[in-house]
Amino acid sequence: MALAIILPLRNQSELASLLKRLYDPTSPEYRHFLTVAQFTAQFGPTGQDYASVEKFARSKGFTVANTPDNRLLVHINGTAAQVNKAFHVTMTNYRHPTEKRTFYSPDREPSLELRVPVVHIAGMNNFSIPRAKYKRAPPNFRRNAIGSGPNGAYLGSDMRIAYYGGTALTGSGQSVGLLEFDGYNVSDVTASFAGQSNSVPIQNVLVDGATAGSDGDDGEQVLDIVQAASMAPGLSQIRV
């Protein structure tokens, strides 16, 4: 079983106050965000508490799989028997009330022989399983080709017309930041405008050794860029 022991944040009232100041334009701390190291030092579990949880897990026979820098999670792997013994539960299979399957879950709330506070232990049950929500169109399905793009496809400008109508709002003087987990090809962005011009500058901000290129699987990144530029054509820049 793959579990995650979740530890609580410290100084939560101070954190709530900091969040207000970070997003208050009148505050000297406006948008002065903390680094991971700064956040961990001020609000994360202490190194001593985190080490205690790691020691506890290993003493119960678990393998510690991952230790994030913010010290909020201790990822562990172990058997059901180890889970039963460590957390004073009995892992049991139950019939799902609404689905034709069984699911596993402990017979009671877990408890730990540990002085360090723990918020939650994730992975103790599979009652809910993530599933794709897409639906396959029937073979005789026909779509209305009413967009302004090739073969009636929708362009970003069509989305602006549909949602904004004749409004004068263009996003003038503002910037949009897009967090993407892969690169993109500029040629794909250009092609997505289908001959329409894009006047919004696109600036790449590469972090942690990332590169701007793509192996071709850049549909999500390109869509995000095109939609932002089309919905707000007066933007001063898009930072990707």
Please place each PLM-identified region on the residue numbering:
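Substrate-binding/charge-relay-adjacent region of secreted/lumenal peptidase catalytic domains
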Residues: 1-69, 75-76, 80-240
